[in-house]
């Protein structure tokens, strides 16, 4: 039987009188890569914040590894669109913040996994945007997470760096077998990376599609079919 990593049942989230998430039901097996897509304001980032316990649900049930938790779970790590590195700490010391007991060996191994060990003694300000995000990823992975939450971490990167980061994230996921939830506005990115794409619509699940394409993925006609189906769903209200 598949072990369920994340279980959401009738999950709701209100901000004042505004209902952002409405009766969301999702079961995510351990090790699955899930992408969340949809219009701005549909509840994608709010859902990640609930799973990370940065926010509390208004009602419903949220289980991580079969348990209902009230505090931030150290086995869940969050990567934001901004790298959020401390400018007064070296690259290595930034990564150590994510490691248990700030262990230097673990931090160096994590930096090596993102191909930045040679930058361990540098300051964040001299790094490129892509390098900063790789350091942020290394910091998250230094905590040996079971669940990695990615909130548009590639959105501000140039096209080439974005492709490189996609390949890096995929290779680390395949190697380390953690569960991933990726929020992205890029449907092509979602289909390229995810086992499963969930489209939110006005705070509810509108589409939940498995992507059974072999890896490494090629952007052929089969890829395009999934991409077009998801895009058509998201854009259906804009068609005249």
From Swiss-Prot:
Keyword presence, Manganese: no
This protein's name: Aliphatic sulfonates import ATP-binding protein SsuB
Enzyme Commission identifier(s): 7.6.2.14
UniProt keyword terms in alphabetical order: ATP-binding, Cell inner membrane, Cell membrane, Membrane, Nucleotide-binding, Translocase, Transport
CC terms in the record's Gene Ontology section: plasma membrane
Membrane topology according to the record: Peripheral membrane protein
Organism of this sequence: Zymomonas mobilis subsp. mobilis (strain ATCC 31821 / ZM4 / CP4)
The family this protein is said to belong to: Belongs to the ABC transporter superfamily. Aliphatic sulfonates importer (TC 3.A.1.17.2) family.
Catalytic function, reaction form: ATP + H2O + aliphatic sulfonate-[sulfonate-binding protein]Side 1 = ADP + phosphate + aliphatic sulfonateSide 2 + [sulfonate-binding protein]Side 1
Job of this protein: Part of the ABC transporter complex SsuABC involved in aliphatic sulfonates import. Responsible for energy coupling to the transport system.
Alphabetized GO MF terms: ATP binding; ATP hydrolysis activity
SUBUNIT field: The complex is composed of two ATP-binding proteins (SsuB), two transmembrane proteins (SsuC) and a solute-binding protein (SsuA).
CDD domains associated with the record: ABC_NrtD_SsuB_transporters
UniProt KW Isomerase keyword: no
InterPro entries the UniProt entry points to: AAA+_ATPase, ABC_transporter-like_ATP-bd, ABC_transporter-like_CS, ABC_transporter_ATP-bind, P-loop_NTPase
Amino-acid positions noted as binding ATP in the UniProt annotation, renumbered to this chain: 38-45
Primary site of residence: membrane
Protein localization: Cell inner membrane
Domain ABC transporter: 6-227
């Amino acid at each position: 039987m598949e072990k369920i990593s994340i279980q959401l049942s009738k999950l709701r989230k209100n901000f004042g009188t505004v209902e952002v998430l409405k009766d969301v039901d999702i079961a995510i097996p351990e090790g699955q890569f899930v992408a969340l897509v949809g219009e701005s304001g549909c509840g994608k980032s709010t859902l990640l914040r609930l799973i990370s316990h940065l926010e509390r649900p208004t009602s419903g049930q949220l289980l991580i590894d079969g348990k209902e938790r009230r505090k931030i779970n150290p086995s869940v790590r969050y990567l934001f669109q901004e790298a959020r590195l401390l400018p007064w700490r070296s690259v290595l010391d930034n990564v150590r913040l994510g490691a248990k007991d700030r262990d230097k060996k673990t931090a160096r191994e994590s930096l090596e996994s993102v191909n930045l060990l040679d930058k361990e003694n540098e300051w964040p300000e001299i790094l490129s945007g892509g390098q900063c995000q790789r350091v942020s990823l290394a910091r998250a992975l230094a905590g040996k997470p079971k669940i990695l939450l990615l909130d548009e971490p590639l959105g501000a990167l140039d096209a080439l760096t974005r492709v490189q980061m996609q390949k890096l994230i995929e290779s680390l996921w395949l190697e380390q077998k953690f569960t991933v939830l990726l929020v992205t506005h890029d449907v092509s990115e979602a289909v390229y990376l995810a086992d499963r794409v969930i489209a939110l619509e006005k705070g509810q699940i509108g589409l939940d599609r498995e992507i059974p394409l072999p890896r490494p993925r090629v952007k052929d006609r089969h890829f395009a079919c999934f991409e077009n189906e998801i895009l058509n769903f998201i854009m259906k209200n804009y068609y005249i």
